[in-house]
Amino acid sequence: MSNFSLSLKDAQDVAIMSPTGYINDLGAERLELTSEQYLGKGLRKIVINFSHVQFINTLGVSIFTGIVQKTMDHEGQLCFTNMKKIHRDIFETVGLIEHVRVFKDEKDALSYLSDRD
């Protein structure tokens, strides 16, 4: 399945990534590369909006683990928003939720991050 696209925007010092479709090998790799580019540019606050994510396969989950680790290595903050219950349950099962902040929507995540340095 290659039904994937990625929308990007910045809100002050926060990078917002909004994937659409299936997060499988190519989609997950694009998310990982984009997050690495943001971290490499010195952006330490990243929001991933899951509102248009339909499916995440096991490779996608493992790449999210890498994104979480790299964000932690850069002393960054990673927030997930608009997660469907099934996606949240998967991330809870593999322990990723312990290392990110989950918010109902982007507005809540941006409000939280605006209070952080």
Residue ranges and their predicted role:
Residues 83, 106-107:
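Short, ordered loop/turn segments at secondary-structure junctions
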